[in-house]
Structure formats: structure tokens, C-alpha cells
């Protein structure tokens, strides 16, 4: 990928990758820590990737030609709260790299943007 996708296409592409039987997911350490901290599980991430929506513009990823997208969704384990997942898709590899997972209601109260977080670690 060399050009970022708009929100609608990003939603469709991420959902398509997430539903592909060849899907491979990697989790950055930060994402694994946030999942544990928030009491969320892998199936919550999969649900959000398969059924969520991208509403925000992407940010460049550290991997050249790739971009970070935030996909948002309520999940079976999140109660009435929505989660946001910052993900770097690699369509040709059928790979989704999870950078972080957040509660959107907490994110909206904090200055700054997690989508700007580095996806290196």
C-alpha cells in the first residue's frame, strides 16, 4: 500500500482482511498490555476488526508505505462501551498489526491522539 485509504475503503479493507481464513495478526507489546489492563480478550479485537468502522484519517506507520487506522466498535465483552483499535493493515500479506486497544470514552477525555503513537514497540 502506498496511498492511504479513505475511511470507507479502510473499513472495507480491514474487515475483508479480518475475515480472510489466511489472516495473521501480530500484537505490539503496548497492545497486549492494554488488552490485559482493560480486561478485553482476543475475540473482542477480532469482533471489532470484522464489524467495526474507521471514522478518522490515517497516520503514517513506521513501515514505509503503510498507514495506521483506528477502527471502532462495541464488542461482546465491552458492555455498552466502544473500543478503538489502532491497526496497521498489510493487505498483500493478509496481516493486521495491532498497535493499541483503547476505551473510546477514555480516549475522548484525554488530550492528544493515540493514533499518533509509534507502532515500533
Regions of interest found by a model, annotated:
Residues 1-121:
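Ribonuclease/tRNase effector modules and their secretory precursors
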Amino acid at each position: 500500500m502506498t496511498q492511504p485509504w479513505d475511511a470507507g475503503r479502510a473499513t472495507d479493507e480491514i474487515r475483508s482482511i479480518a475475515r480472510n481464513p489466511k489472516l495473521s495478526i501480530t500484537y505490539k507489546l503496548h497492545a497486549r498490555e492494554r488488552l490485559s489492563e482493560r480486561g478485553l480478550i482476543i475475540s473482542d479485537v477480532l469482533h471489532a476488526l470484522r464489524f467495526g468502522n474507521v471514522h478518522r484519517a490515517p497516520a503514517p506507520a513506521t513501515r514505509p508505505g503503510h498507514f495506521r487506522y483506528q477502527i471502532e466498535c462495541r464488542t461482546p465483552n465491552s458492555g455498552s462501551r466502544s473500543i478503538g483499535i489502532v491497526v496497521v493493515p498489510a493487505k498483500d500479506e493478509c496481516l493486521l498489526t495491532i498497535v493499541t486497544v483503547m476505551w473510546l470514552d477514555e480516549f475522548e477525555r484525554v488530550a492528544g491522539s493515540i493514533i499518533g503513537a509509534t507502532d515500533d514497540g
